[in-house]
Regions:
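Post-transcriptional modification and biogenesis factors for structured RNAs
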Residues: 1-197
Length: 197
């Protein structure tokens, strides 16, 4: 049974560390973050689709991607240890609890993850501005395969190194007035094409 304690709005701001709490806060255990060794041991239980987040910077985007992924049945997410958003209170809040239904693997080297996945029959798709249209029949063959989908950072996209390791590139084409979408929005559109929740 949880204990409920009433506090002033100033006390709540202080407890949470900001005023973005809608008048309510809950103390919870931080979700467990796994490493590359855990990923290797779990290789047969990662799921049909794994999302690899290539230096996503905004914790709120990270949380929103996890929320979207879990909605579409994704349970495994890979993030780099350095130069990337981590699992903060903001990321947890943005995930709307979805993070507690997922496994996040924090790794030193994404290339090593891709090598491991390739050996274990995963195909890699990387997001790009000028890749293959996700509605293209050319990509239909990927829909029944195990997939590692790489989502690039908000500013730089997928790194050149990781692009070279992809089996194919994928893009979402709009009306050209705007050249890209928020990464969490793009995640939802991509997963609606490739995931079977």
């Amino acid at each position: 049974k949880s204990k409920i304690k009433k506090v002033t709005s100033i006390e709540l701001d202080s407890l949470v560390g900001n005023s973005d709490h809608q008048g309510l806060a809950m103390k919870i255990d931080k979700p467990e973050i796994f490493d590359f060794e855990n990923l290797k041991r779990s290789i047969n239980n990662l799921g049909k689709i794994i999302l690899i987040l290539d230096h996503i910077q905004d914790p709120h985007n990270l949380g929103a991607i996890i929320r979207t992924g879990v909605f579409f049945g994704v349970k495994s997410f890979v993030i780099p240890k350095k130069r990337s958003a981590s699992i903060t209170s903001g990321a947890i809040k943005s995930s709307a609890g979805a993070i507690f239904h997922s496994n996040v693997y924090e790794v030193s080297n994404i290339s090593n993850v891709l090598k491991l996945l390739k050996i274990n029959n995963y195909w890699t798709l990387g997001t790009e501005i000028d890749g293959n249209d996700i509605n293209s029949k050319k990509l239909d063959g990927f829909k029944n395969l195990n997939l590692a989908i790489i989502l690039g950072s908000e500013q730089k996209g997928v790194s050149k190194l990781l692009k070279k390791k992809c089996d194919s590139s994928i893009s979402i084409y709009g009306n050209k007035k705007i050249d890209s979408l928020n990464v969490s929005v793009a995640t939802g559109i991509i997963l609606s094409k490739f995931a079977n929740p």
